[in-house]
């Protein structure tokens, strides 16, 4: 019995304990650069939606697919991170994922139609999906456990500030040179990241020819895709009055049942649901789902509203979103301080701030001033910064290093699902209320309306 104890202890030791400080810093810089770039591409289209909508002759909900389908593809492909890392090694998977999303980002800028743009955005999300979970796994393994809070804060800034940099710089470039250059700007930095990762990441041997559980992967993918289609097209097709929506709902339910049944009975399932037996991990997954729902939605909905109805230029919209990045930076430093007291304080405080910022936005109208929007964006940033660090540390506090890659993949899967589904629901609600408001307004229009206005 005593002989097994050292093996357990060894499994809990990070490989990075033996790395020099200089090597850790280089790994940190290159990994954070790659994850920042990928996070930048997630929402880079948010300030570009109005321009792309005109260029592609698309409706509001159609052009939003360029956002939601990218996040959906990321969500579907993220769970494959564990298998890819085991099959090809973390270094190779991380490096070539950065290269792939760099190439697909260039192709997004070169797209000439809505269909091609959505195709390349889907490939961009799917091929780059391993970057975020692998980045966090590599960093946590490269640093001693006592520095986990610091590393998580730095990585969190990359994940949160990346989506802020994209719309901000993208808005400026689109106003000066057109929306395509917001995508093109990623390419040279992406190639630098690819070369840097190749030079700095330590080589790791694949664990062998691990068989992919195709039943689990396909059933999960079909479930997510069908639910996303229901949410994206439901309002346009009048929900369950449409045969398509009914069929997609039935297929989603059936595929989800297959996924759960198979995962609980297979010897090596695609996702190990037994990780959910860890109470902290299960609670963390629930909270990160909510975090994903409230994190990206304002950044998708506000830019079209401000540009189309309030007449804000792209550059000013980018500056408003940039305030969110400033708030996030403040939030991360606050999270480190609060975490020394009790992580639960950070979680409660962060989600409370997020709720207050949403309540604040409920009261704005088209006469809102820039200062109010920037202040609200700043509060949102502080909230997401304060939440991220304690949420990540608490979720993975009991997860063994051997399960870290798979656990991280599920964590980011639920974060992306929360974002994608809630964005689609929000846009469906906007389309519904817009139609209802239009109907009410037309009730007061008749042939005499213009005559009375002229006489007045």
What are these regions (language model features)?
Residues 47, 71, 78-216:
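Helix-loop-helix hairpins in multi-pass membrane proteins, especially solute transporters
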Residues 14-19, 146, 194-221, 236-241, ...:
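Flexible interhelical linker loops that connect adjacent transmembrane helices
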Residues 187-205, 221-233, 251-265:
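C-terminal membrane-cytosol helix-exit motif in multi-pass small-molecule transporters
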């Amino acid at each position: 019995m005593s002989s097994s104890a050292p093996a357990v202890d060894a499994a809990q030791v990070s490989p990075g304990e033996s790395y020099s400080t200089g090597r850790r810093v280089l790994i940190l810089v290159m990994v954070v650069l790659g994850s920042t770039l990928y996070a930048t591409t997630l929402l880079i289209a948010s300030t570009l939606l109005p321009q792309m909508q005109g260029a592609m002759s698309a409706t509001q909900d159609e052009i939003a697919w360029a956002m939601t389908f990218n996040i959906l593809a990321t969500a579907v492909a993220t769970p494959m991170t564990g298998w890819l890392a085991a099959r090809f090694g973390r270094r190779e998977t991380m490096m070539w994922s950065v290269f792939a999303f760099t190439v697909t980002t260039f192709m997004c800028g070169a797209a000439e139609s809505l269909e091609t743009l959505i195709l390349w955005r889907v490939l961009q999300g799917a091929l780059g999906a391993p970057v975020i979970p692998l980045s966090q796994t590599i960093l946590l393994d490269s640093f001693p456990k006592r520095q986990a809070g610091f590393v998580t804060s730095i990585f969190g800034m990359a994940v949160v500030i990346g989506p802020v940099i994209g719309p901000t710089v993208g808005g400026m470039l689109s106003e000066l040179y057109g929306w395509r250059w917001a995508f093109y700007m990623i390419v040279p930095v992406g190639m630098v990241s690819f070369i840097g990762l190749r030079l700095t990441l330590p080589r790791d041997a694949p664990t062998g020819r691990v068989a992919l559980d195709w039943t689990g992967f396909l059933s999960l993918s079909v479930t997510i895709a069908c639910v996303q289609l229901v949410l994206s097209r439901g309002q346009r097709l009048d929900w369950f009055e449409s045969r398509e929506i009914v069929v997609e709902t039935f297929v989603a339910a059936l595929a989800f049942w297959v996924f759960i049944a198979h995962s609980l009975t297979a010897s090596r399932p695609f996702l190990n649901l037994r990780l959910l037996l860890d109470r902290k991990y299960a609670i963390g997954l629930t909270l990160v789902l909510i975090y994903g729902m409230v994190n990206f939605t304002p950044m998708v909905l506000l830019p079209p509203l401000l540009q189309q109805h309030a007449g804000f230029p792209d550059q000013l919209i980018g500056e408003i979103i940039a305030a969110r990045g400033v708030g996030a930076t403040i939030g991360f430093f606050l999270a480190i301080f609060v975490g020394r007291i009790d992580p639960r304080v950070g979680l409660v405080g962060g989600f409370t701030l997020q709720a207050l910022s949403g309540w604040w936005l409920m009261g704005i109208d088209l006469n809102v001033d820039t200062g109010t929007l920037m202040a609200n964006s700043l509060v949102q940033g502080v909230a997401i910064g304060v939440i991220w660090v304690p949420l990540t540390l608490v979720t993975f506090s009991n997860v063994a290093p051997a399960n870290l890659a798979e656990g991280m993949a599920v964590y980011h899967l639920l974060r992306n699902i929360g974002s994608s589904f809630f964005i689609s629901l929000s846009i469906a609600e906007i389309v519904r209320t817009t139609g209802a408001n239009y109907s009410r307004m037309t009730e007061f229009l008749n042939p005499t309306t213009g005559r009375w206005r002229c006489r007045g």
